Amino acid sequence: MTDLDPVVLAERLIDCPSITPATGAVFDCLQAMLEPLGFAIHRFVAGEAPDGPVENLFAIRKGPEGARHFAFAGHLDVVPPGEGWTSGPFKAERRGELLYGRGAVDMKGSIAAMVAAVAEIPADAGTLSFIITGDEEGPARYGTVPLIDLIRQLGAEPDLCLVGEPTSVHRLGDMVKIGRRGSVNMWIACKGAQGHVAYPHLADNPIPRLVALLADLDALVLDGGTEWFQPSNLEITDLEVGNPATNVIPAEARARISIRFNDRHTGAELVARVEEIAHRHKGEVRAVISGESFITLPGAFSAMIADAVKAETGLDPELSTSGGTSDARFLRAVCPVVEFGLCNATMHKKDEAVAMEDLRVLQRIYRRIALSALS
């Protein structure tokens, strides 16, 4: 067993720029951390521009024959830093009690905490693995999905998987995610016939039809929520005509909507419902389902996480399904999956930062979770 400082590990990862889609140096850095701990490393690059190339890493340290297998999943890619940082986004900086840098909380910090945690777990405790992608913040086409394919080819499916997304809100340990709503985006087009505004009888203006279509969609009440999920919501996210002329009736009007939905629906059902309304207004729909809703019902796995959090923080975490999508939506097809990590207040913001003490507490929480999962 080795004693590693999660703050130092986080600094090393932050110092490797890894804007999504990520490849290269940041994976070299993680590999250099894991190999001395006895992990066998599998790395591969998938996809092509514009959504790739993407690097992925699966690291496994096998325990005794028949031992339980606990996996930690996460991502090394980060969103672009933007402007206005008070220090370099890809040069970790300690100021006061905080560690600054892009990825500090989302989610290089939690990866560092888990590496430090497993360094304290003996090899004979069971099988441990890391499922790490460079394609979570982007389209997520070439990341966790092909990683799952590799894991199945290796016959290395875990019994339980913890995703290290920053789930905490006000204090480390106040929230654990046991599920997520599904997500579907749709592009709607109403076509007409271009013409002069002074001769409307010679044209077909698609805008009134699109406006009426969107009004029908906006009036929908999808549900009132379920036991573990908030109500589904449909949002109009874009309107486009692309008509710079004041005297021209356009030939086409377009809109985009996004639906976040709970376990009362499937993506396909919602697409069909929108298509039915769109067809009444002579509209066409193209849809992309990003993921279905899922839940790991409260039970032994969530209890061991809650117990670990309570032991180290004194908090009783809320079990929640709020928030956006994550790669847990893919991993749930392999084994039970729960998400827990750092406070998310500064994720995707300038001057992203994590309390250094939170990294050390998270290391201890993760160690407790892993040992419980392997027992």
Swiss-Prot record:
- GO terms, biological process: diaminopimelate biosynthetic process; L-arginine biosynthetic process; lysine biosynthetic process via diaminopimelate
Cofactor(s) essential for the protein: Zn(2+); Co(2+)
Q: Where does Zn(2+) 1 bind?
A: H75, D106, E165
Q: Which key words are in the record? A: Amino-acid biosynthesis, Cobalt, Diaminopimelate biosynthesis, Hydrolase, Lysine biosynthesis, Metal-binding, Zinc
Q: Spell out the catalytic residues.
A: D77, E136 (proton acceptor)
- Superkingdom, natural source: Bacteria
GO MF entries = acetylornithine deacetylase activity; cobalt ion binding; succinyl-diaminopimelate desuccinylase activity; zinc ion binding
Q: Enumerate the Pfam families for this protein.
A: M20_dimer, Peptidase_M20
Query: Which pathway, per its entry?
Result: Amino-acid biosynthesis; L-lysine biosynthesis via DAP pathway; LL-2,6-diaminopimelate from (S)-tetrahydrodipicolinate (succinylase route): step 3/3
Alphabetical list of InterPro entries matching this protein: ArgE/DapE_CS, Bact_exopeptidase_dim_dom, DapE_proteobac, Peptidase_M20, Peptidase_M20_dimer, Peptidase_M20A
EC number(s) from the headed UniProt entry: 3.5.1.18
Read off the CDD domains from this record: M20_DapE_proteobac
Any note on cofactor binding? Answer: Binds 2 Zn(2+) or Co(2+) ions per subunit.
For this protein, what reaction is catalysed? N-succinyl-(2S,6S)-2,6-diaminopimelate + H2O = (2S,6S)-2,6-diaminopimelate + succinate
Instruction: Answer yes or no on keyword rRNA-binding.
Output: no
Residue numbers binding Zn(2+) 2: D106, E137, H348
As recorded in UniProt, coiled-coil segments are none
Q: Its function?
A: Catalyzes the hydrolysis of N-succinyl-L,L-diaminopimelic acid (SDAP), forming succinate and LL-2,6-diaminopimelate (DAP), an intermediate involved in the bacterial biosynthesis of lysine and meso-diaminopimelic acid, an essential component of bacterial cell walls.
What protein family is recorded?
Belongs to the peptidase M20A family. DapE subfamily.
> PANTHER family, alphabetically?
ACETYLORNITHINE DEACETYLASE, N-ACETYL-L-CITRULLINE DEACETYLASE
Quaternary state and interactors: Homodimer.
Supply the name of the protein.
Succinyl-diaminopimelate desuccinylase
This protein's species is: Novosphingobium aromaticivorans (strain ATCC 700278 / DSM 12444 / CCUG 56034 / CIP 105152 / NBRC 16084 / F199)
